[in-house]
Amino acid sequence: MLSMGHGDELAIVDANFPAATVGRRVIALPGADAPTALDAILTVFPLDDSVNPAVLTMEVAGDPTATPDPVVAFFAVLTGHGLGDLPFRALRRYAFYERARDAFAVVRTGELRPYGNVLLVKGVVNSYTPMP
C-alpha cells in the first residue's frame, strides 16, 4: 500500500471473492473480517475527498435497496474514523469485479458474511492531511 498513489484504488473483500482471479496483487488477511481490515487500513490510508464516491460497496443481487450486515459495519468503521458523512455507492456484482480488477491491490479477508466487499480510493498524504 505504501507504493499506492493518489487516486489508486484498494479492494477489501470477503473470503468468497475471486481475489486470485481478479486481483493483480492479492494481500491475504485470513484472520480478520472485512470491517476489522478496513479499520486497520484507515489508520494509514487517507480517502480521496475530491472524488464522489471514494467508497464503493457491492450491491445485493436482486435487492439493490438492501444494506447487508458488512456494509452496516463498514459505515460504523467509517464513522469511527470521522468519515461517516462521506458518500458511498453500491455497484452491481460484475461492475465491482471490474473495479477490483483495476485496483492496485485486493485485500482478501476471512470475512464469511456475503457482500463483505468495499473499494477505497486513496487520497493525498501531506502535511495538511491529518491521518485518522
Q: Where are the regions a protein language model picked out?
A:
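Short, basic, glycine/proline-bearing loop/turn elements
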Residues: 23-26, 57, 78
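Glycine-rich, aromatic-bearing surface loops/beta-hairpins
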Residues: 64-132
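C-terminal catalytic "cap/lid" subdomain
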Residues: 27-34, 49, 107-111
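Gly/Ser/Thr-rich active-site loops/lids in small-molecule metabolic enzymes
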Residues: 26-42, 131
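Ordered, amphipathic secondary-structure segments that act as subunit-interaction surfaces
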Residues: 47-73
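Sequence-level motif detector for i,i+2 pairs with an aromatic at +2
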Residues: 7, 53-55, 102
